[in-house]
């Protein structure tokens, strides 16, 4: 339990220190820290439409649409604890605005459990624990499938292209391997930091994964199923402590976030950190976090591990089945950062060997490029976008 104790100690240190140094309300938040994705679009020259998409199992997800003029539809899928907002936070430099300016028909999806996915036809996320009984498996098998089908019906297109970051890539690989008919509906998939095999994850995330079973028991004993939801008190406190003055940038970002995602202090400046905190974290389920811990600890890209007895009941096997990546026959482009401790070059090399069609592969040139630089770096237009557009052209 040493890792848990250390985490609690760090959080208490942040709370006490920030309370001493920070006076709430002194720092006026950046405008972009408070804008909705619709307001972002208007500010940067594009209209944004909102749609409700209902999954097969009753979850209601918000799908944002930035209409394009000349090119095909692209669906963007965010990472864990994130939302569709992530792709527009950089304004004119963001992926959404960049694609829209190029004429693409842009769709930004959300998964169950984040701030745009806390609705269900029958379940109440505040009172029904069943609402939170999901991991990234369901985000791929149900959520992504529903979003893709909605876009195809809405546009009368035969297929779309997808771009995923982190968990957004996991969802794509789950869908394409579990429901192979979607390989015809997704004709090209760009995977930014593809999170599948996580055998070589580095500390501190690897240390947390070792404590995964203990963390899981601890959370379940407290009845905690939703983690870091947008409206939860813990998230509100975190956003308050980490959005005030430049002091919080050094304490919350440089000292706490960067060790997890990769030390690269030059691509996220203090002013933009304030924008990030205004929109993140956005919530997920306990089970989603634990499923990733299982990938790290068990060193397999596999279904959720419920334990031998429940596994046998669900899967007819004592261990959860691996996802059959040989079923992924669509065109795939893999992007990996040399300084990403979560999705490492070694693990992406394993993924490359598992795919039946040789994927396009791009190792990011800056040596310090990390896990979150794919969505928030201040030089994405130089080091990332040219290769994204090259992949999209190959998908035509």
Positions of predicted regions on the chain:
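N-terminal cap/lid segment of alpha/beta-hydrolase-fold proteins
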Residues: 37-67
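Conserved alpha/beta-hydrolase "acid-adjacent" motif
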Residues: 341-347
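Alpha/beta-hydrolase active-site loop
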Residues: 130-152
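Short, surface-exposed "cap/lid" segments of acyl-processing enzymes
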Residues: 55, 66-121
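Alpha/beta-hydrolase-fold enzymes
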Residues: 153-158, 169-313
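Short beta-strand/loop motif that positions the catalytic acidic residue
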Residues: 328, 334-336, 340
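Catalytic active-site module of serine/aspartate enzymes centered on a nucleophile-bearing elbow/loop
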Residues: 362-396
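Cleavable N-terminal signal peptides of Sec/SRP-targeted secreted and luminal proteins
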Residues: 3-27
């Amino acid at each position: 339990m040493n890792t848990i104790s250390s985490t609690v100690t760090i959080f208490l240190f942040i709370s006490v220190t920030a309370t001493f140094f920070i006076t709430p309300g002194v720092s006026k938040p950046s405008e972009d820290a408070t804008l909705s994705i619709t307001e972002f679009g208007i500010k940067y020259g594009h209209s944004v439409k909102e749609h409700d998409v209902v999954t097969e199992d009753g979850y209601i997800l918000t799908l944002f649409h930035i209409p394009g003029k000349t090119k095909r539809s692209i669906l963007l899928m965010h990472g864990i604890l994130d939302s569709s907002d992530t792709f527009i936070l950089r304004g004119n430099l963001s992926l959404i605005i960049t694609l829209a300016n190029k004429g693409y028909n842009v769709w930004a999806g959300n998964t169950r459990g984040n701030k745009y996915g806390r609705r269900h036809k029958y379940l109440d996320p505040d009172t029904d624990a069943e609402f939170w009984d999901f991991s990234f498996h369901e985000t791929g098998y149900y959520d992504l499938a529903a979003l893709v089908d909605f876009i195809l019906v809405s546009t009368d297109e035969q297929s779309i292209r997808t771009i995923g970051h982190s968990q957004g890539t996991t969802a794509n690989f789950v869908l394409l391997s579990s429901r192979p008919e979607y390989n015809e509906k997704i004709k090209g998939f760009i995977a930014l930091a593809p999170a599948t095999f996580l055998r070589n994850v580095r500390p501190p995330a690897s240390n947390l994964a070792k404590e995964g079973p203990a963390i899981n028991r601890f959370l379940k004993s407290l009845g905690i199923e939703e983690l870091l939801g947008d409206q939860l008190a813990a998230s509100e406190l975190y956003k308050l402590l980490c959005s005030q003055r430049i002091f919080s940038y050094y304490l919350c970002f440089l000292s706490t976030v960067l060790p997890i995602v990769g030390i690269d202090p030059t691509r996220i400046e203090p002013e933009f950190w304030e924008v990030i905190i205004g929109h993140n974290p956005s919530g997920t389920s306990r089970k989603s976090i634990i499923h990733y811990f299982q990938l790290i600890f068990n060193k397999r890209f596999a279904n959720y591990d419920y334990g031998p007895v429940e596994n046998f009941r669900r899967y007819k096997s004592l261990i959860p089945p691996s996802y059959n990546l040989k079923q992924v026959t669509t065109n795939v482009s893999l992007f990996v950062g040399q300084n990403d401790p979560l999705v490492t070059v070694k693990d992406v090399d394993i993924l490359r060997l598992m795919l039946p069609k040789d994927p396009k592969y791009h190792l990011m040139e800056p040596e310090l490029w990390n896990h979150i630089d794919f969505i928030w770096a201040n030089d994405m237009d130089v080091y990332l976008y040219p290769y994204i557009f090259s992949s999209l052209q190959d998908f035509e």
